[in-house]
Amino acid sequence: FRDEFDNDKLIEQGRFFYPIDPLDFYLPDPSQPGRNSAPPGWLESNVVQIVDPDHYWFDPSGRTLHLVMRLHLANSGYAAVLKVTEQGDTPGTGEMITSFEHFPSGGECRIIALPGGQMKFHILYDPCTKLYWLLSSQTTDSMTKAQHMPADRINLPNNERHRLVLHFSKNLIDWCFAGVVAIGQTALDARHYASMMIDDQDLCILSRS
């Protein structure tokens, strides 16, 4: 990430919301004591495959996967994306090359809009409905000044962990709200770091609390 990230320039993958000291691991904003955060980066990847032949990023050979990752820049609603291409003659074989995806214009695509992309999320494809399901944390006040946050909120304003929600999409880009999974009674009652699996017509969800 540091090879691609330059805090002094507004570049394609975004810019950290607060000023940071690259030598200080946990201090994005020295003016807000107690409101610290891990350093910026892309992490906690989801491995997905695009199976719709009409999609711009569809690979008819079946050898392309996409990594959709938490975009930790202290903002909310975005995720990072990378493309992984298998070099073998058949899917599942050969060396795997990681690169950036591209827009139809030819420009590199490094970030996409994704509800809850600022925290760990889980994407699951359902072949029956042909939909991607997204389990993620809902942020409600990421633009509140850090010094004005309630005492029971940890770290930065976008780091809200007690509202777990569900979305669905047919293309990984356009997400529709499906419903609320769980809400903790207070900001300290976390409902996040969740995962899910399909059981016939049901979604089984496991969540940190």
Say what each PLM segment does.
Residues 44-46, 120-122, 193-195:
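Conserved beta-strand position repeated once per blade in WD40 beta-propeller domains
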